[in-house]
Amino acid sequence: MMTDKLNLNVLDAAFYSLEQTVVQISDRNWFDMQPSIVQDTLIAGAIQKFEFVYELSLKMMKRQLQQDAINTDDIGAYGFKDILREALRFGLIGDMSKWVAYRDMRNITSHTYDQEKAMAVYAQIDDFLIESSFLLEQLRQRNQYD
């Protein structure tokens, strides 16, 4: 079992940036006044930030599991769903199926660009913010500096 604390600064900053982007886009009066190219760029930026926060979340989830594990070699060999199962068991996440769905969302946007698919992914970012906020709070609690 390791005792080093995780540095959550990058995840904190990325999460905050995504959250603020979604808040700005949610201001319908402001958003509707923007030219369509700006609207598209803002949505694309939010999706890219989602992808980044998602990837960072998984990395931090895995690192925390390595911190908590008795045998860290086991965690290193785990596949994606194994990581999620352990994260659920350790209380880092609340709903494994949502994290599987987020991976599917990330795969959709990273392999092709289709406006309809992009909007479907964007529509799920609010839910992702709730789930990733839960993860971030669990990570903060486990990595408090005295």
UniProtKB/Swiss-Prot annotation:
The keyword Nucleotide-binding applies. InterPro entries: HepT (IPR010235). Its EC number is 3.1.-.-. The keyword Nucleotide-binding applies. Coiled coil: none annotated. The active site is at 106, 111. Gene3D superfamilies: Nucleotidyltransferases domain 2. Belongs to the HepT RNase toxin family. Homodimer. Forms a complex with MntA, probably with a stoichiometry of 2:2. Probable toxic component of a type VII toxin-antitoxin (TA) system, probably an RNase. Neutralized by cognate antitoxin MntA. Neutralization is probably due to AMPylation by MntA. A mixture of HepT and MntA binds nucleotides; the highest affinity is for TTP, ATP binds more tightly than ADP or AMP. This is Probable ribonuclease HepT. The lineage of its organism: Bacteria, Pseudomonadati, Pseudomonadota, Gammaproteobacteria, Pasteurellales.
